[in-house]
Amino acid sequence: MLRRMNFSVFAVMTFAGLFGWLTVSGQLVDGFAQDTKSQPASTAATQLPMPDPAFKGRIGETYKDSTPSYPLPVKASKGSPNVLVILLDDVGFGMCSTFGGPVPTPHMDKLANNGLKYTRFHTTALCSPTRAALLAGRNHHSCGTGVIIEMGTGYPGYTGIIPKSTALVSEMLRDHGYATGMFGKWHNTPEPDISPAGPFDRWPTGLGFDYFYGFNQGETHQYYPTIYRNTSWVPQPKSPEQGYHFTADMTDEAIAWTRNIRAADPDKPWFNYFSTSGVHAPHHAPNEWREKLVGKFDHGWDKQRELTHATQIEMGIVPKGTMLTPRPKEISAWEDQPADAKKVYCRLMENYAAYMAYTDHEVGRLIESLRTSGELDNTLVMYVVGDNGASAEGGLEGTFSEIASLMGVQLGLESSLKRIDEIGGPTSEPHVPVGWAWAMDAPFQWTKQVASHFGGTRNPMVVHWPKGIQSKGQLRTQFHHVIDVVPTILEACKIPEPKTVNGIPQKPIEGTSMVYSFDNPKAKDRRTTQYFELATNRAIYHDGWVACSKYGLPWETAGRGDGFLKASWELYHVNEDFSQASNLAAKEPAKLKELQAKFLEEAKKYGVFPLDPRFSERMDPKLRIAGDPKTSWIYYGNSVWLPEPIGPQLFPRPHSIAAEIVMPKGGAEGVIVCAGAFSAGWSLYVKDGKPNFRYTFFDIADVTIAGSDNLPEGKVILKTEFTPDGTREGGGTLKMIVNGILAGEGKLKRSAFRHGLEPFEVGRDSITAVSPDYKTPFAFTGTIEKVAFELTKK
């Protein structure tokens, strides 16, 4: 009887569970007429993702007397606009023709003539911080991104890790029914996470983007990029000789993505974050675009600033009476440059400008595709013209290889002059000299990195949305910041700010919507306070005034010391002094003191402390490694591909490489292991039966060490041992050993812990060849059983 009763209860409970007869407490209810009410829309809409919809049908005993209610995906409100956020890179306020600059940008002009031009819009002065703030709607320190991700340290404002409490607009839009895609430069994934093992929650696809096509790091070679599709590396679709350039490639991808979204769902709005490489170094422009600008900058950087300033006043971009700030004493006058220097500097600037003009062309292609499809009218375009000011990181002379500069190597004017005809092409990695960067930031002081002055932080913006904005071709002068983009998008799309995302309470959005200014040019500013800070360059804007303190030079990225605590402060009444030209600190000490106190208040509020002037010193990967750093690595097989920072960090430390390979009958050839690129890198390979080790270092310390004999058939242990000589240049002796017998030896004059933009690989050299002895991919045709690396104590 007991068994029968238990079975009966079990049967009733099972049947009741199927049809919903029981409450949580176990009481029977009338499940055949249930209609559970969903949460109020206002609550559900602020909890992302939204809760599963309640069942609204009717369940009877059989399907014939039941009414289904299929759960549908969240849909955006009818008529919701598409959103296109375009972000350029390292573009100064005075570069583009749209804002009075010398570089022709007709597609940006066209968009602005049918939209709005914001001339008091601001960024953070550096890449990753601006990008995090742009997408999160919070200040860069609130997003853990007080510096670029490669410089993250263990403080909340500087981790280089966007917290889960600051969800991105991509997550908000996706969870409200938008398709989301990201194309181009990301630069917000912590460097240790950029690997096949992830974790992937900090990649674009883990932060709200359905689709990603681009690169994770701060820059890439435009002819030989390191591209990811979602979370997987993909080879470029064609070669530079076939016309390949990454800017065109990412544009093709973005156009195809929007067309496929529309083909699959005619009503689904999309969010496209289109973040170009242009015009971050290396500056790569197709030859036909360079040819268009030959001779355009022969007058030099001083004259160019004067011309730009005059055009800006004539166009109304800057108010009448705006002063042109003088050249800093640290930058030489154009007239003092030697003839050969002028020749090189003009070529570098022509190439830089051509890169901008070409980028405008590709952005225009994307815009025209939307015009053709009829989608442009209801697409909110927010076109941010630079993530910071123009870059002075090319140094006073510019450079043929900015990768060399990043590694602390100044190739000098002679190197650029020798290879002047290659500038802008696939064999170059060029960057303009400081003087041209300063000229492109007219009328302001300073450049990228300098968050204290508008040359680093004031980037113009174009807004275009025919269906949502009546005004056309007008200026907007309200003071705004990159954190204001997200609340603007949310208001335009009628989406509430989320309170929780994935169960995590959210920090309030710190930006202010700009929608109020769309059709009201005289609207009173709604952003009255904004702090700025980057590597101790700091400023505070409050009610039309700016107090600021600059420290260090942006092209000197090491050894800045701690003098920032004694650095002087300046004061500007920027409501009347557009260009920060008249320092009022001595005349208005009370106002300066008031603003200094305001900066401290904002800095404490948003996690700016501790201040840290170090720049290149913070690039040390050991600052971001938990536990003891690795001293040995083993990789198996013929196919390993890793970003170089994730692979073994060998040079200039003492180390050994031991490859266990099998040479088939008749021999084999190919790359066993390599890291880096054509300009700098190392490769251990077999050619014509003999082992070779190549170290390439910007044509100034290249060396190939070849083995004396052919490798024997069968199993071979091929080993290299490097012993540093203790010099600052990282030179040393490298021995090549085959099956325990010395087979070759040579000297490396220089070496470095990192070699640019290309990966570490076992079994091939996929992108550009480290050695001129072979062409990519030069895959090894024998068998690689394993390759072991060890840091030694010699």
Indicate residue ranges for each PLM-predicted region:
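Extracellular glycan-associated modules
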Residues: 610, 614-794
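Formylglycine-dependent sulfatase
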Residues: 17, 28-570, 578-597, 611, ...
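Extended recognition patches within non-cytosolic domains
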Residues: 588, 592-603, 783-794
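Acidic glycine-/aspartate-rich tracts in secreted/extracellular proteins
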Residues: 140, 576, 792-794
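N-terminal secretory signal peptides that target proteins for export/translocation
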Residues: 1-7
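Asp-box/BNR beta-propeller loop motif
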Residues: 575-579, 740-741
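Bacterial N-terminal signal peptides
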Residues: 10-27
